């Protein structure tokens, strides 16, 4: 990673690690999950020190990696791949109970939502996404004039 971040003009890194820790035990049968987490935090600390201008987002919803330890090393968290606005209200409420809004990646998604199939107006999707670090996860060229106006 250091070589890539040094050689290429990379400004953003998404750290995506889902829940499974492998292996769960070392060769002697001792639990190794704690060591794996400590290693991840140490690696991220080295990357941040060597590349302070690279923005790091932890994709943590599936990995259960939203905690104070990880927050020291990333700029924000992606809380869930479910970007259905109605579903995101509960997800974001839980996140905001212990983390600041600027650390929450929150995107306006397409309608119907890919995870639920729900159709929701652009205004609702945008307002829900604005509670965090706002992003747009759809093709703006496919929006109607009304949707573009609501998003703007």
Q: Can you name each region flagged by the protein language model?
A:
Residues 1-123, 133, 137-145:
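Active-site neighborhood of glycoside hydrolase catalytic domains
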Residues 147-152:
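Short, intrinsically disordered, charge-balanced linker/junction segments flanking boundaries
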């Amino acid at each position: 990673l250091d070589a890539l971040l040094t050689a290429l003009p990379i400004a953003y890194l998404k750290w995506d690690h889902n829940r499974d820790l492998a292996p769960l035990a070392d060769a002697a049968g001792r639990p190794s999950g704690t060591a794996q987490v400590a290693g991840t935090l140490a690696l991220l600390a080295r990357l941040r020190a060597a590349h302070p201008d690279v923005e790091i987002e932890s994709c943590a919803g599936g990995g259960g990696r939203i905690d104070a330890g990880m927050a020291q090393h990333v700029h924000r968290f992606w809380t869930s791949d479910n970007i259905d606005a109605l579903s995101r209200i509960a997800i974001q409420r839980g996140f905001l109970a212990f983390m600041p809004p600027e650390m929450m990646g929150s995107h306006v998604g397409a309608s119907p939502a890919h995870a639920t199939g729900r159709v929701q107006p652009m205004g609702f999707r945008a307002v829900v996404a604005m509670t965090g670090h706002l992003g747009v996860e759809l093709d703006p060229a496919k929006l109607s004039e009304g949707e573009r106006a609501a998003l703007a």
